[in-house]
Structure formats: C-alpha cells, structure tokens
Amino acid sequence: RHVQGWWADGWDLLLTPTLAAPPLPIGGLYGDQGDGVDPANPMAPSIRSGRFVAFTPQFNASGQPAINLPLHWNDAGLPIGVQLVAAYGREDLLIRIASQLEAAAPWADRHPT
C-alpha cells in the first residue's frame, strides 16, 4: 500500500536491485555456507533463497508490473540486475524504458566470463 502512494505522488518508477548480493556460484544455496543456516535443514536452500531475492517476490506476488535488466557486470563478468517497478497498468512504461536502456547499453551478446 505504501508503494501505491508513490504513484499518486507523481513517481513514475521504483528502482531496486534485482538480488541482495552478486550472483551465487552453482550450488551456492546448498551445504554449509557459514551463514548460520543448518545445512541439514531441508529448507536451507529456500531460507537462503529468500534472503537472496529480497526485492522481487512482493512484486511477483502482487502482480505489480516490474522488469529486471542486466545493467552492470561485476569483475567476474556476471550480470548485476536492476529492477524497475511501475504503477499497475504501466507495463508500457517499463517496456519503453527497457528498450531505451538496451539501445544505450546492449546486453544481448554479453556472456559471463
């Protein structure tokens, strides 16, 4: 509800990170990661995943229009995503902005190193 008030105040977009940390290596949600999560707990991957994707679930669950774009790459060549969120019914704005960003900094041919 709080976010919905931003659109009424005249904001066009909300900008958040896609992930709460850089991309994990394969298997990074399993085993002993030294994060206090018991690796024997069958829910350990879900617990870690919830911490990792803290910015996207509320928009997925609510149907709020959002788009995630790979706008930066770290030193390992992994994409760092940015999430843009718009008001209900403003998918057109997200698609236009995404198109402009991709034209300015294409990513289709970028691959992790």
Model-derived segments and spans:
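Serine-dependent amide/ester hydrolase catalytic core
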Residues: R1-A61, H111
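Structural helix-boundary/capping segments
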Residues: R48, N60-T113
